[in-house]
């Protein structure tokens, strides 16, 4: 090969790499942010393609994908069927995890405190005001519970984590269901708000005798003590990938529009009661086909090569049969403006 030919080959390969590299943007739920950030870092190292994901809350993710200011949205609160239809959006699950109650009690270690759903609801209703309340003491006989006021911390932003939390409380407490209800944002009876899982974790970490709720990875990363919860079977369980997997084991993904299955208060002796899937949203009519294809490529890579990273962060990867259903939808439901299929 001549020097000129070698130079042309190098220039061509450099140009090819440059043109192939893609940057995609996503925003939404803070619940999956730790794993999405990890996946994005790994993906860029392996492929050169960038994924910029902003943790702004599920409400923001839904709003921005509707407004078409991002390439994909993320939400832990599955979008309602009428909105999916109105805005021609495809929704699919990407990861499974769990929300945990976290506490700042100097005498209590992770998993030591036991709470039932009813007691948890009464705490967040402001009815149980002190840590040594008889209802808590009954579940924790022999524990050194302080005679201190409980400081409740909740989310201040529109949040899929809040949706899952309030959905669970609505299932275990009639009073909660009738007075507060469920949603990405609710009128809290008591407490102070933190923005994102990050904000709630920071508040609980700093404020003694507080209680809040965060995705499990945030509890571990911030070295917060979590409570064990009594599940639907009456068993006290610890949060873990295994207990999240147990809750998701019998999920009927195709029973809900957009695969929007809710996994709170599921059956099973080992099921964690506040388990959730986190969902991805994108437009079915791809105005920028190459970008939509890049979104598919990223999540295809994550489903195949991101499982170990997900497990290390205590998330649960999707089962293979669910991935096959998702990718079948990519092929049939998402098209370019000229009707071409973007996923083969």
UniProtKB/Swiss-Prot annotation:
SUPFAM superfamilies: Periplasmic binding protein-like II (SSF53850)
One Pfam family here: PBP_like_2
Residues annotated to bind phosphate: 29-31, 58, 76, 159-161
Presence of keyword Transmembrane helix: no
One GO term of the biological process aspect: phosphate ion transmembrane transport
Signal sequence range: 1-18
Predominant localisation class: periplasm
GO cellular component, one term: ATP-binding cassette (ABC) transporter complex
Keywords: Periplasm, Phosphate transport, Signal, Transport
GO MF assignments: phosphate ion binding
InterPro entries: ABC_phos-bd_PstS, PBP_domain, Phosphate-bind_PstS
Subcellular location: Periplasm
Keyword Transport set for record: yes
Assembly mode: The complex is composed of two ATP-binding proteins (PstB), two transmembrane proteins (PstC and PstA) and a solute-binding protein (PstS).
Family the entry assigns: Belongs to the PstS family.
Functional summary from the UniProt entry: Part of the ABC transporter complex PstSACB involved in phosphate import.
Protein name: Phosphate-binding protein PstS
Taxonomic source organism: Pasteurella multocida (strain Pm70)
